[in-house]
Amino acid sequence: MESFTNDRLQLPRNMIENSMFEEEPDVVDLAKEPCLHPLEPDEVEYEPRGSRLLVRGLGEHEMDEDEEDYESSAKLLGMSFMNRSSGLRNSAAGYRQSPDGTCSLPSARTLVICVFVIVVAVSVIMVIYLLPRCTFTKEGCHKTNQSAELIQPVATNGKVFPWAQIRLPTAIIPLCYELSLHPNLTSMTFRGSVTISLQALQDTRDIILHSTGHNISRVTFMSAVSSQEKQVEILEYPYHEQIAVVAPEPLLTGHNYTLKIEYSANISNSYYGFYGITYTDKSNEKKYFAATQFEPLAARSAFPCFDEPAFKATFIIKITRNEHHTALSNMPKKSSVPAEEGLIQDEFSESVKMSTYLVAFIVGEMRNLSQDVNGTLVSVYAVPEKIGQVHHALDTTIKLLEFYQTYFEIQYPLKKLDLVAIPDFEAGAMENWGLLTFREETLLYDNATSSVADRKLVTKIIAHELAHQWFGNLVTMQWWNDLWLNEGFATFMEYFSVEKIFKELNSYEDFLDARFKTMRKDSLNSSHPISSSVQSSEQIEEMFDSLSYFKGASLLLMLKSYLSEDVFRHAVILYLHNHSYAAIQSDDLWDSFNEVTDKTLDVKKMMKTWTLQKGFPLVTVQRKGTELLLQQERFFLRMQPESQPSDTSHLWHIPISYVTDGRNYSEYRSVSLLDKKSDVINLTEQVQWVKVNSNMTGYYIVHYAHDDWTALINQLKRNPYVLSDKDRANLINNIFELAGLGKVPLRMAFDLIDYLKNETHTAPITEALFQTNLIYNLLEKLGHMDLSSRLVARVHKLLQNQIQQQTWTDEGTPSMRELRSALLEFACAHSLENCTTMATNLFDSWMASNGTQSLPTDVMVTVFKVGARTEKGWLFLFSMYSSMGSEAEKNKILEALASSEDVHKLYWLMKSSLDGDIIRTQKLSLIIRTVGRHFPGHLLAWDFVKENWNKLVHKFHLGSYTIQSIVAGSTHLFSTKTHLSEVQAFFENQSEATLKLRCVQEALEVIQLNIQWMVRNLKTLSQWL
């Protein structure tokens, strides 16, 4: 699945960071002055969102700390008998000692009862504490829950629920689902029935599976030896979204059974599960559409199922629809037959064996363009008025599909492959087997309005989702702790395949950019290993972050570079062949590599140092004669030096590559493995400089001794092209990151980028703009306007020649066009080089033509932003927004509207997107991030997030990538203790699950680091800048 943001880079899908220490780029933050007076208890009762006291349904009564813990335990276990009312406490007051009375002696009966109660209570406590503890692995707890023998959760009907764990038991597995659905897109409800063929792997009496939000009307059970259906009762345990069927007979190992469940449910109004969409077509007619998004845990909301990735099965799906609608699912349509009331029922062929999260179905009005590719019918679908924008996607898909089949030496196994542009979709895209779903802006391409960046976005996301047909669909991780096996591989293949097939797009620049941003996130204490233990739904949702995607991909790039492309490819082919249609763990991947390397290198041992611990190494390099002295430690952004964790536990096996001035760069590269704290590399000759981590293929930062930094800086000034553009960008990134850590003077970082006046490549310039923009944003948001202006003037002086050479056209290579876009946006944002005048002239001509005059696509967003600075321009852009047929153009308009200096307009934009009527709610994250990037809105976004937190969580789900992005984007530019206290207080007032979210902890850490950066650098920066 592709998380989505359509910013400059893609951290799960294009994110641009604007804070000093936040990886999710485009986000924004805004906050009002915090409340200076603590709330009285009476005031808490009237909080708009409600406090945790009121959530527990206690009304005006408060509860002390022990009682709140007790109530939490009751909720956790689902035990109604543990609930206590305040009335019990009040009645107890009568037994308290009166101040002026004597203590009456209790009766013998009373003493016996009291002693008995105490003995029972102590016994229960001892049993609970003496029970064997479960040892959790990263896959979760596999020990039998012995405490369940004494304390069991309670189902909704008051009976004991026979299973207490979040993970399903493995005694029963599904073999095949027959699913029939009849959605009503007007009432937004649906009826369904699912028949599940089961097999018992162990003797049991209970069938435990997932179900949530279903009104179950009938459940029947049948064994393989009997054709008689038996109606059975179900138990529901909503807290774990589970149901239990108690079979009428023992289920015996190796025997097959059939379970049929009939139910009804609402079509979701969120972006999760089987959800509904309404939109207005060109004729202003309201249209209805329904689609699915099941990853990670939402298949259970559409039909009862074993909703864990390891429970693979086949699926036969039937959908009843209106005659004017089209229904699609994973497999080709097998038949269409008339149903009741003039409806039609489509039946789809039985699927291959797959996980529940990959099941998909869509109902709505669509048109398609198709082409056969070696027996597979490839089709791209869109709503009727946008069918003209699917040609690029179809051509791209055909080329990539052929490439993957050749590279993996495994044919795509299905007879059809559909790609569908969904009118309203939260994720960037989803890899459902045979039915890929996309946002319209990530699949559709309009030649007249789509920029080169839009083309790259569409191409890369198609490449990503197609790669999933092998990595994730054919071979699937057993549990969400190893999500990186899906997403890391798909992300790596996304860049690798585009570089192979569409070399002119220079996708390596985007991959480099993404690695830089991911490492910023991974350098925080709130980071996590890419293979991490997860259990709760919030923990699983949070695994869909830039680390699973881009760190996973970066580690694979590093491994490929170290082993060679041929060895890497052979290991991947072996891995796919050995585990087709299976569910695997990380060790299965590394075993395939070890088999190919013939154990000359223990790849498993090497790579576990990268996947099972968070963070990455800082490699310190010192050159002494012909020796390179190397040392490794964790690169850790910390609030104070003493807060850094002990370094003794951090050790990576690091592929060390380097280049020097002693050999021809294009022909010489040396690689060795640093698998201990320090080591020495012997050079073959005396050299003037050495650059470690050649082409930045390694996932680490390099720090040089002062003289070696100086030698590299001097070489860049003499002739930067001795080093590749990747290496030049890498040096810029590393020195600014080290300056942020205090290991290098900030002035030395600016000395290094002085060479930029001679730079012509995109990657180094965009990285320098990014790093200096981080500093500018902090200075501006704190009101240091003179200092921020001096910073802009210095950067402008370095890039003045390049800016003056730009034309307002779409001419040049894709890389040149992206550089033009970045330079002109920088110039216009700061009113440099007559940029505003040129953009205003273009905008006025476009507005005079009522939007019919074409604009250069690569500078379109810059022109729109300048135009939106006036009241007339803003209103005209807004009037054009709804009528635009291109999502690429609509996004450019939206970004311009959200860049206004009018806070009333900004608030209205965010509110309109949240409501979803004029601007779709899927755009809200983009709007919030854009609002917060600019000075007038940087406090407004945080206020909006606070005021609408409950609505946001309902729409996007706690822990989801969108929530991560919104939290980061509305806080990551704060750099005062006042804002730190406000953000912390707000989240402490939410649920415990919210406070524990990794994105919340990360937001607090980022604010602290911003504060630290300003304390460390502001004075010296003002002295020499």
Swiss-Prot record:
Residues recorded with modification Phosphotyrosine: Y70
Location, primary (coarse class): membrane
Residues in compartment: Cytoplasmic: 1-109
Binding residues for substrate: E295, G428, A429, M430, E431, N432
Record field: transmembrane: 110-131
GO cellular component, one term: cytoplasmic vesicle membrane
EC number: 3.4.11.3
Annotated region described as Tankyrase binding, given as residue ranges: 96-101
Active site: E465 (proton acceptor)
Glycosylation sites: 145, 184, 215, 256, 266, 368, 374, 447, 525, 578, 664, 682, 695, 758, 834, 850, 989
Gene3D superfamilies: 1.25.50.20, 2.60.40.1910, Neutral Protease Domain 2, tricorn interacting facor f3 domain
Keywords assigned: Acetylation, Aminopeptidase, Cell membrane, Glycoprotein, Hydrolase, Membrane, Metal-binding, Metalloprotease, Phosphoprotein, Protease, Signal-anchor, Transmembrane, Transmembrane helix, Zinc
Topology class, membrane: Single-pass type II membrane protein
Phosphoserine: residues carrying this PTM: S80, S91
Subunit record text: Homodimer. Binds tankyrases 1 and 2.
Protein name: Leucyl-cystinyl aminopeptidase
Organism: Mus musculus (Mouse)
